[in-house]
From Swiss-Prot:
Mg(2+) 2 binds at E294, N296. Disulfide bonds: none annotated. Belongs to the GARS family. The lineage of its organism: Archaea, Methanobacteriati, Methanobacteriota, Methanomada group, Methanococci. This is Phosphoribosylamine--glycine ligase. It comes from Methanococcus maripaludis (strain C7 / ATCC BAA-1331).
Length: 444
């Protein structure tokens, strides 16, 4: 069974591992750098940019896969799924138009407005800097609301800036908004939204064009440093719980979040056609219930590393059900286990990361700790590993409870030597208690 995988990060390493649990799978991967974890699982690798559509076509024509799985967002944005579907290859990953739920923040917000989907917020989109932006921000200030400045296109999770975190106040938000246009960050178009106050969580679904099957809820940690301090990153780690919920969210609130995602899928279908693939909703649990921060048209990274290792159902079967519109005929199960994922990242990440420095990884010690190792933005050359400037590698601890899973992950994360750092507090009971207390305060 030939499977084409596009992408070379830790998320794709998790996808590759999950696929290879089926002994029939022969994996063929197109990726930019030599990720040693994915390379070891692949029959053949094409080293090309994941947005190089002619290279994707050439590789697919050569290997003739029976199904394709697209990992990152960038190939979705250039129509990789459209190409593969046109070639007659069942594909897991939305086509270019449905993928706008991630690639165009304006499309996402307009969809919520048009179809009156719950969980929306006050926002405005702008094509240039001028009086309109300043007036909108001034209006938000008069309402007592801080703002979030979001480049409208893809920025790898690092273009968003929030007042009270990366920005001092709404006046500084104006300065950053001008910078987005001056530097054409994320395509040189922006969304300015009201800042949501609450606790973040993520919810994933398998989507087959009509049906959505939900996965366990996960909490990501986007801030670079312990205690949720520092700049926003692509995600420093995450955890999930044995009951598939989270300690600070009720079943009712989780159900409301699921209904928001269900209506989103239906609205995408009505607006631009069927959505097939993985859908990731990033939510803020506020005093008014769950609100959507943004959607991703693929697995979250790091969340894929929490979810896929505890998937009991054959992942290849799930992929075919997505591609063929048959999710309603499947009973998809996850183990009732806790997971904790922690990332090592280059010193200086995400602002000014060191690059092309050697990273020593004690793989045996990580295995002995009981953790799973996932390679991310790593390049292997002549038997040595080099960091490339983005997140380097992740470890995942899995156990009956969060406390034990965190201990496994922490023991494992100490087995990297190089110019890297990590957050030691992810999955700890102290940090989780802070989340619970924050939600209690919201309810008052």
């Amino acid at each position: 069974m030939k499977v084409l995988l596009i992408g070379g990060g830790a998320r794709e390493h998790a996808i590759a591992m999950a696929l290879k649990k089926n002994e029939l799978v022969e994996l063929y991967t197109l990726m930019k750098n030599k990720n040693p974890g994915i390379y070891a699982l692949s029959e053949e690798v094409s080293f090309n940019s994941e947005t190089d559509v002619p290279a994707i076509k050439e590789f697919a024509e050569k290997i003739k896969p029976e199904i394709a799985v697209i990992g990152p967002e960038s190939p979705l944005g250039v129509g990789a799924a459209d190409l593969l579907e046109e070639m007659g290859i069942p594909t897991v990953g939305p086509k270019k138009l449905p993928a706008q739920i991630e690639t165009s923040k304006e499309f996402m917000r307009n969809l919520f407005k048009k179809y009156e989907i719950d969980g929306s917020l006050k926002y405005a989109a702008f094509n240039e800097y001028g009086n309109e932006i300043e007036s909108f921000i001034d209006e938000m200030t008069s309402l007592g609301k801080d703002v979030v400045v979001k480049p409208a296109g893809l920025t790898g999770g690092k273009g968003v800036k929030v007042v009270g975190e990366q920005l001092k106040d709404n006046d500084e938000a104006k300065i950053y908004a001008k910078e987005v246009f001056d530097k054409s960050i994320g395509g040189g178009k922006i969304i300015i939204e009201e800042k949501l106050v609450g606790v973040e969580f993520t919810l994933h679904g398998f989507v087959d064009g009509e049906n959505i099957t939900f996965m366990p809820a996960v909490q990501d940690h986007p801030h670079a440093y312990n205690n949720d301090e520092g700049p926003i990153t692509g995600g420093m780690g995450s955890y999930s719980c044995p009951n598939h919920g989270l300690p600070f969210i009720s079943e009712d609130m989780l159900d409301r979040a699921e209904k928001i995602m269900e209506k989103t899928v239906n609205s995408i279908n009505l607006e631009v056609g069927p959505y097939k693939g993985f859908l990731y909703g990033q939510f803020m649990l506020t005093a008014d219930g769950p609100k959507i921060i943004e959607y991703n048209a693929r697995f979250g990274d790091p969340e894929a590393m929490n979810l896929l290792p505890i998937l009991k159902t054959d992942f290849l079967d799930v992929c075919f059900a997505i591609a063929e519109g048959k999710l309603d005929k499947m009973n998809i199960e996850f183990e009732n286990k806790a997971t904790v994922c922690k990332y090592v990242v280059p010193n200086g990440y995400p602002i000014d990361p060191v690059k092309n420095k050697e990273l020593a990884v004690a793989e045996k010690a990580i295995e002995d700790a009981g953790a799973i190792l996932f390679y991310a933005s790593i390049n292997e050359e002549n038997g040595k590993l080099y960091i490339t400037g983005s997140r380097s590698a992740a470890v995942v601890g899995i156990s009956e409870n969060i406390e034990e899973a965190e201990k496994i992950a922490q023991k494992a994360i100490e087995n990297f030597k190089g110019e890297v750092y990590y957050r030691s507090d992810i999955g700890t009971l102290d940090l989780i208690k802070k989340r619970i207390e924050r939600v209690k305060k919201l309810a008052k």
